Amino acid sequence: MASTEEIPRSLAGKVALITGAGRGIGKGIAIELAKRGASVIVNYNSADKPAQEVVDEIAKTGSRAIAIKADITKVPEVSRLFQEALQHFGHLDIVVSNSGTEVFKPEEEVTEEDYDRVFNLNTRAQFFVAQHAYIHLRNGGRIILMSSVAANMSGIPNHALYAGSKAAVEGFTRSFAVDAGHKKITVNAIAPGGVKTDMYDANAWHYVPGGKPGMPMEEIDKGLAAFCPLERVAVPQDIGRVVAFLAHPDSEWVNGQIILLTGGSIT
């Protein structure tokens, strides 16, 4: 967990765009980058108030932020998001593609609509966010995509749609890392396990042996923490701190990697 000591503003002068930053993991990432001095574009799709609350929280750190509403499943909206970000701050150094959705559904019940909804956000949108980042980032920039531990897990029923959508992102990561190298842009993906967010609250019981709908959250947390040597589950700040390292110049030799963020959990 985070300490209360002062954090060096090691990202001062950098500008970071984070998709899905109005809540959950994206919010945690936005706050951690801002604490280190980065100016932040808080992208969101629907809820204005939570996004503005993130902007206000960032202001308390002494960093600058704006919220930009854009549906990143639509390529013209991705283009507009980047143009508005550039118009406001003048340049971009860091792009974190965080937006996503999770689904558990028996394979025989998955519809075309289910498939398109999950892959449009988890996969297609991440490709075009990464594409725009590659085009618009300054030399030496950072692209950080969002995979999941689920991409490489076995034994989780009814999870093919989500797992497949994240596995594709890992392929994007390795390929973009090659293509972006001439601009000295690094491209990595993080693959978290369970992180305490609203998505966790809705879905984490699926990962607990013997889990069932309506299971008390305390039991879910205890069940998942039992797999972790650190004896807890993750919070968004844990993910944000790793992203802050990947965004820092010191991380340059980390490139084309998929970084598991599980606290050492046995999966």
Curated annotation (Swiss-Prot):
Q: Where is the active site?
A: S147, S148, Y162, K166
Task: Identify the keywords attached in UniProt to this record, alphabetized.
Answer: NADP, Oxidoreductase
User: What GO MF terms are annotated?
Assistant: oxidoreductase activity
The EC designation for this entry is: 1.1.-.-
UniProt xrefs under Pfam families: adh_short_C2
PANTHER family, per this entry? OXIDOREDUCTASE, SHORT-CHAIN DEHYDROGENASE/REDUCTASE FAMILY (AFU_ORTHOLOGUE AFUA_5G02870), SHORT-CHAIN DEHYDROGENASE_REDUCTASE FAMILY PROTEIN
Function of the protein:
Hydroxynaphthalene reductase-like protein; part of the Pks2 gene cluster that mediates the formation of infectious structures (appressoria), enabling these fungi to kill insects faster. The product of the Pks2 gene cluster is different from the one of Pks1 and has still not been identified.
The entry's protein name is: Hydroxynaphthalene reductase-like protein Arp2
Q: Which organism is it from?
A: Metarhizium acridum (strain CQMa 102)
Q: What is the lineage of its organism?
A: Eukaryota, Fungi, Dikarya, Ascomycota, Pezizomycotina
